[in-house]
Amino acid sequence: MTALLIDGNALSKTLRTQAAQRAAALTARGHQPGLAVVLVGANPASEVYVRNKIKACEDNGFFSQKDAYPDTLSEADLLARIDELNHDPKIHGILVQLPLPAHIDSHKVLEAIAPEKDVDGFHVANAGALMTGKPLFRPCTPYGVMKMFEAHDIPLQGANAVVIGRSNIVGKPMAMLLLEAGATVTICHSKTRDLAAHTRQADIVVAAVGKRNILTADMVKPGATVIDVGMNRDDAGKLCGDVDFAGVKEIAGHITPVPGGVGPMTITMLLINTIEAAERAAAAA
């Protein structure tokens, strides 16, 4: 059995078309959705991510601006800039590209973003609200994964789900969203004693640790849905995920590729969150 491919590019295209329609409707009412992306330093990977986010905005009728600063920028100056963006009516979403230089406290910076403009969903107010099932914004990557389940009619209620990874960005919020959808969730991580014992019981596995081949074919239950959030390079320098794709696709029922799986969905859900922020602001105006 070869797994059905969950195509993140195709689903992203559909969702971005919907986002563009909502953006056009808002713009016609004088409320063009606006995203500010803040980049500190010259991390090449971060520059690519920021460029992709800005392009996605431009392609879909959003206003966007990039604030790029040298890595010598002080924490105080960055916090002052975020405060300005919090009060800028043209800006509905603020995204600070991580990682930040070592001298800047990323927690303090993320907490400085107004919760109603926290389109990454990382502010403690939104992270806490996720626990109660009522967040203003869901973090983009887990939100995108949930849309993939929905698009492919993958049943979550009563399913055994394993999330490999416990980061605040993917692992923990992913577990919360699966729990909210009625799955029985296990979070595995670097201290988990027997990872395979957990994954072999799972109907759904989400791998999000940034480690090649953390999940191999012998660790997967036949017919399981496998979501690969990882972004790594193989020995030849080619992009790959956390899952041994060639082996696992022969066992799983559904699987996401890398590239072309979860990656495109992350930026798409950033657009959706920004639209929702703009719609709330327009309703309150």
From Swiss-Prot:
GO cellular component, one term: cytosol
Superkingdom in the source lineage: Bacteria
Catalytic reaction equation(s): (6R)-5,10-methylene-5,6,7,8-tetrahydrofolate + NADP(+) = (6R)-5,10-methenyltetrahydrofolate + NADPH; (6R)-5,10-methenyltetrahydrofolate + H2O = (6R)-10-formyltetrahydrofolate + H(+)
Coiled coil: none
Single GO MF descriptor: methenyltetrahydrofolate cyclohydrolase activity
Pfam families given in the database record: THF_DHG_CYH, THF_DHG_CYH_C
Keywords: Amino-acid biosynthesis, Histidine biosynthesis, Hydrolase, Methionine biosynthesis, Multifunctional enzyme, NADP, One-carbon metabolism, Oxidoreductase, Purine biosynthesis
Classification via CDD domains: NAD_bind_m-THF_DH_Cyclohyd
Pathway field: One-carbon metabolism; tetrahydrofolate interconversion
Annotated EC: 1.5.1.5, 3.5.4.9
GO BP term, pick one: purine nucleotide biosynthetic process
Residues involved in NADP(+) binding: G165, R166, S167, S190
Quaternary structure note: Homodimer.
Function: Catalyzes the oxidation of 5,10-methylenetetrahydrofolate to 5,10-methenyltetrahydrofolate and then the hydrolysis of 5,10-methenyltetrahydrofolate to 10-formyltetrahydrofolate.
Family: Belongs to the tetrahydrofolate dehydrogenase/cyclohydrolase family.
The protein's name: Bifunctional protein FolD
Species the sequence originates in: Burkholderia ambifaria (strain MC40-6)
